[in-house]
């Protein structure tokens, strides 16, 4: 018997279409303390970021593993850790590579602007590298919505405070898993690790904008390939390659029956797919993410998202589904099937729309953090 309810996140076109685009030449200054200041002007705004190191999002023993639980040595974790920066006040999560000159910057700012190195690497201005800034937007023709399945409660709930790591905030420990198609999409292990790390950093930045007190800690990454991917992945697909929603049930059972140290320690196990999910192959809509509700209280840890090619866009899906796993509903919604103490511990203000729902008071406000 599965816990209480499952959230189905579906989209008609794309979760986060791209708005305005502009080429910028950001400056990067580093202080003796390790803080960085990044400045640029984009879309009519002067941007100044005061960035602090954010390598703590990676666990101390963070590593990349293959599907056989073998640690991969091809990734320089400490170098990656040093490149991670955040400015919580401005909703910024960035990967800054100082080894390249001029420095390259990739990530999100104000929770609504994506910045990345321009493909014309040789284009510079006064020693500054060209970058592209894209506005992430939502519109009425491209939105996310949910459906809910509510079976009976059969599992005893445990205290939400079990994930309190005695830190100043609540630390959510996460294991992210890639299907074989996602693994193949990344040219190298390093590229895959950078994508997943940036995905996690942007997801945390979105949570910080909600004043949630949540901090993510990425325990590790598990990558499946043709040789190691469990049969349940193919068994859960339609002929056109889209996953069936039952996939989340099956992958949840898989980690229950085949636990590893990472999966046992994780509060949430996120599965990164390269396809959406559909009830029927010819459905007009597709699920872009699925999650068990209140998984931190039940042991049903799995959630899955369609991980778009841009990590900054996929982060909206991951943040939405992880929030459901932690007991958050859509803005303005409440389900009586959820224990009262959970709903009181975690609440989502109506002014934040990462948990928006395309109906009622929140019509047209889907995934707007600004």
From Swiss-Prot:
One of its GO terms (molecular function) is metal ion binding. It is an enzyme of class 3 (hydrolase). Zn(2+) binds at residues 320, 324, 330. Residues 1-15 form the signal peptide. Residues 170-370 form the Peptidase M12B domain. Metalloprotease that may disrupt the cell matrix and the process of clotting blood or hemolymph. This is Metalloproteinase.
């Amino acid at each position: 018997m599965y816990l209480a309810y499952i959230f189905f996140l579906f989209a008609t076109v794309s979760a986060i279409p791209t708005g305005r685009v502009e080429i910028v030449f950001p400056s990067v200054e580093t202080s003796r303390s390790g803080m960085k200041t990044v400045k640029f002007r984009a879309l009519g705004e002067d941007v100044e970021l005061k960035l602090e190191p954010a390598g703590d999002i990676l666990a101390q023993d963070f590593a990349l593993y293959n599907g056989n639980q073998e640690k991969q040595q091809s990734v320089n974790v400490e170098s990656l850790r040093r490149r991670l920066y955040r400015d919580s006040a401005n909703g910024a999560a960035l990967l800054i590579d100082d080894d390249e000159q001029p420095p390259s910057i990739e990530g999100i700012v104000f929770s609504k602007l994506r910045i990345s190195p321009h493909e014309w690497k040789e284009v510079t201005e006064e020693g500054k590298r060209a970058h592209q800034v894209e506005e992430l937007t939502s519109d009425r023709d491209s939105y996310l919505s949910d459906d809910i399945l509510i079976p009976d409660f059969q599992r005893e709930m445990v205290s939400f405070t079990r994930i309190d790591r005695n830190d100043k905030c609540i630390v959510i420990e996460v294991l992210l898993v890639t299907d074989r198609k996602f693994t193949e999409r990344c040219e190298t292990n390093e590229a895959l690790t950078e994508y997943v790390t940036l995905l996690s950093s942007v997801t945390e930045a979105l949570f910080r904008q909600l004043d949630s007190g949540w901090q993510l800690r990425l325990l590790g990454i598990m990558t499946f390939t043709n040789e190691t991917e469990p049969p349940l992945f193919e068994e859960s697909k339609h002929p056109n390659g889209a996953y069936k929603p039952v996939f989340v049930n099956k992958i949840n059972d898989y980690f229950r029956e085949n636990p590893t140290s990472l999966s046992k320690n994780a509060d949430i196990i996120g599965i990164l797919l390269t396809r959406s999910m559909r009830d029927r192959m010819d459905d007009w809509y597709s699920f872009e993410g699925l999650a068990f509700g209140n998984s931190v209280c039940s042991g049903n840890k799995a959630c899955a998202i369609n991980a778009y090619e841009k990590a900054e866009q996929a982060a909206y899906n991951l943040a939405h589904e992880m929030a459901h796993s932690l007991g958050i509903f859509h803005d303005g919604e409440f389900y009586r099937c959820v224990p009262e103490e959970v709903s009181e511990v975690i609440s989502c203000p109506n002014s934040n729309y990462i948990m928006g729902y395309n109906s009622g008071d929140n019509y047209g406000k889907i995934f707007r953090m600004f």
